[in-house]
UniProtKB/Swiss-Prot annotation:
Database matches in SUPFAM superfamilies: Ankyrin repeat
Cross-referenced InterPro entries: Ankyrin_rpt, Ankyrin_rpt-contain_sf
Organism: Acanthamoeba polyphaga mimivirus (APMV)
Name of the protein described by the UniProt record: Putative ankyrin repeat protein L897
Matches recorded under Pfam families: Ank_2
Domain of life: Viruses
Keyword Calcium: no
Sequence ranges of the ANK repeats: 88-117, 181-210, 248-277
Lineage, highest ranks first: Viruses, Varidnaviria, Bamfordvirae, Nucleocytoviricota, Megaviricetes
Disulfide bonds: none
Keywords: ANK repeat, Repeat
């Protein structure tokens, strides 16, 4: 047998290219394993071979080659929960990316092989931790296609794999992430109360206030004071005045009042969130506030910011309404 002669770093790429060659040329004649190994040897030496063989024989040999390859580079049994003789194109891209064979993976997808990034990341997270993941997405692979990075980022936050999300936004790959995915990552960070991710992104990117609207409201509703303050600070100092004025029409203060979060109320008012509509909510009885102490505390904050004459004028109406 000539298998030991084959460099294990090249073997997987060779057999995959052979498989594609067979499919492209519709080769279906029979061949034995010895002849197949001779064919591989000839390809390594860049020689042309006229040997023909059937697809089944080759695919079985491909799977044998995969075992040979993975045993050479790691102790991880990549086939533990996988249908061994699946002969599915996705199977090969899954294997290549899972073991960090990036050149092979790029070759596969460039030749139309499909892959499921969610399946790959979930497997890595469950079985491999960060070791193989870092090997796959190391900053050395900065020529990695943007679509692959964004697919991976989206799969990471969609599957709630926090450490993978954190890795991407701290790596040099972050410049390749689309605006839509960045906003989704911030929204995910708000949901899991990870202020570090948010701080990194708001420092690296300039957002329009409207980008913040949904995630900002969610931060207030989550009672997350630190994240709300971080977002407010970014809005105040990294957006233009016109955008900020539009943003101030949000209902964040209403949520803070309903949740009786006085620190949040004070924070929002101090950052110049408009309070006119809050007084209006009181007058219309739109807020379910039946505790006089609670109402007094809210009005105290409003008095400090809003025109005192207007606030005092409305005070009696508000109290009577409740």
């Amino acid at each position: 047998m000539k298998i030991p002669r084959i460099n294990h770093n090249d073997l997987f790429a060779i057999v995959i290219k052979l498989r594609q060659y067979i499919q492209d040329n519709k080769i279906d004649n029979e061949i034995n394993i010895v002849d197949l190994i001779d064919l591989i040897d000839s390809m390594i030496e860049n020689k042309t071979s006229e040997i023909k063989f059937d697809t089944v024989t080759f695919e079985i040999f491909t799977d044998i080659s995969l075992i040979y390859y993975t045993n050479k580079i790691s102790d991880i049994n990549i086939f533990l929960d996988h249908n061994f003789y699946s002969r599915d194109n996705e199977y090969y891209t899954y294997f290549a990316l899972s073991i960090g064979a990036m050149d092979v993976f790029k070759w596969l997808i460039s030749h139309g092989f499909s892959y499921d990034m969610s399946k790959i990341l979930n497997y890595l997270h469950k079985n491999c931790g960060m070791s193989i993941f870092r090997k796959i997405f190391d900053d050395d692979f900065l020529n990695m296609d943007n679509s692959i990075i964004n697919n991976a980022v989206k799969s990471a936050y969609s599957n709630e794999i926090e450490e993978y999300v954190d890795y991407f936004i701290r790596s040099n790959h972050v410049v390749k992430i689309t605006r839509e995915n960045i906003i989704d990552v911030i929204e995910y960070a708000v949901q899991i109360n990870n202020c570090d991710i948010i701080k990194i992104l708001v420092k690296k990117f300039i957002f329009w206030a409207n980008d913040y609207r949904k995630i900002f409201i969610q931060a207030v509703r989550n009672n997350n004071f630190t994240i709300t303050k971080t977002l407010l600070h970014s809005i105040m100092y990294r957006t233009n005045k016109e955008t900020l004025i539009k943003f101030n029409k949000n209902e964040a203060l209403k949520y803070a009042i309903m949740m009786k979060n006085y620190d949040m109320i004070e924070l929002l008012i101090n950052y110049n969130i408009q309070t006119d509509h809050v007084v209006k909510y009181h007058i219309e009885g739109a807020l379910d506030i039946k505790n006089d102490d609670h109402l007094d505390k809210i009005l105290k904050y409003i008095d400090e910011i809003v025109c005192k004459k207007c606030s005092k004028k409305n005070r009696e109406v508000v109290i009577i309404g409740f």
